[in-house]
């Protein structure tokens, strides 16, 4: 059993250790890594999960080479890493995904940020932002849409989000949960937790929910020890 853990924007693989510990004690091997442009990884820019999802798909393929094609592989991500984990569903079918404070749609996220902080409607900015990203970084920021990757995918997804998140509103996780089709998918909201702080605010409860989710998926506390 292997858990691949994806960190958030501006941090590196060391921020994943607090999550890796949960999986390690649950019998999982863990993979932590620096996403492109962060830490010791190369890269000139970040694509908020679009190209990073292909990197995670390559990591999954590598894990299967080492542990076998039938090994259990799950993803955990925080913030941008959570969006990356969900976007990976376009390329791979992991056994589960745990997404902590993801955004559902990049355009919606930018619209909310602009309205909240600059009081500018997104219609004035979005075409310029898309053209600039396409010209300078060769990617379409509007295509970074985790909810589109989730739709129709029969993968159990556990969504975790702080209700006091001031960067990505918890309503993004509510939207994503509604798009989930696997009956083992879950949504858990943490009172008074700001962005990516749920595990800090309520470590014991966070770990309990992760292990309960894995148990419901048949991957913890069962005879499945792959």
What does each model-identified segment do?
Residues 20-42:
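Conserved alpha/beta-hydrolase
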Residues 4, 9-22, 35:
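The serine-hydrolase catalytic nucleophile loop
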Residues 152-154, 159-161, 165:
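Short beta-strand/loop motif that positions the catalytic acidic residue
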Residues 46-67:
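Alpha/beta-hydrolase active-site loop
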Residues 166-172:
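Conserved alpha/beta-hydrolase "acid-adjacent" motif
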Residues 177-196:
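Catalytic histidine neighborhood in serine/cysteine hydrolases
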Residues 193-207:
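Catalytic histidine-centered segment of alpha/beta-hydrolase-like enzymes
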Residues 87-139, 148:
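Hydrolase active-site cap/lid region
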């Amino acid at each position: 059993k292997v858990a691949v853990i994806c960190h958030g924007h501006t941090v590196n693989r060391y921020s994943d250790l607090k999550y890796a510990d949960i999986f390690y004690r649950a019998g999982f091997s863990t993979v932590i890594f620096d996403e492109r442009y962060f830490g010791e990884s190369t890269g000139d820019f970040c694509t908020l999960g679009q190209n990073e999802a292909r990197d995670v798909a390559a990591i999954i393929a590598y894990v299967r080479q080492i542990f076998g094609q039938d090994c259990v592989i799950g993803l955990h991500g925080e913030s941008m890493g959570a969006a990356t984990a969900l976007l990976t569903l376009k390329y791979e079918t992991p056994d589960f995904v745990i997404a902590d404070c993801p955004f559902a749609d990049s355009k919606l996220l930018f619209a909310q940020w602009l309205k909240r902080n600059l009081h500018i409607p997104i219609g004035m900015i979005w075409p310029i932002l898309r053209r600039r990203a396409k010209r300078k970084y060769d990617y379409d920021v509007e295509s970074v849409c985790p909810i589109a990757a989730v739709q129709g995918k029969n993968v159990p997804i556990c969504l975790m989000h702080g209700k006091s998140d001031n960067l990505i509103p918890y309503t993004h996780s509510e939207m994503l949960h509604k798009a989930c089709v696997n009956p083992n998918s879950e949504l858990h909201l943490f009172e008074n937790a700001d962005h990516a702080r749920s595990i800090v605010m309520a470590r014991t409860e966070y770990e309990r929910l992760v292990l309960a989710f894995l148990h419901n998926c048949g991957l913890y506390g069962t005879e499945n020890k792959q």
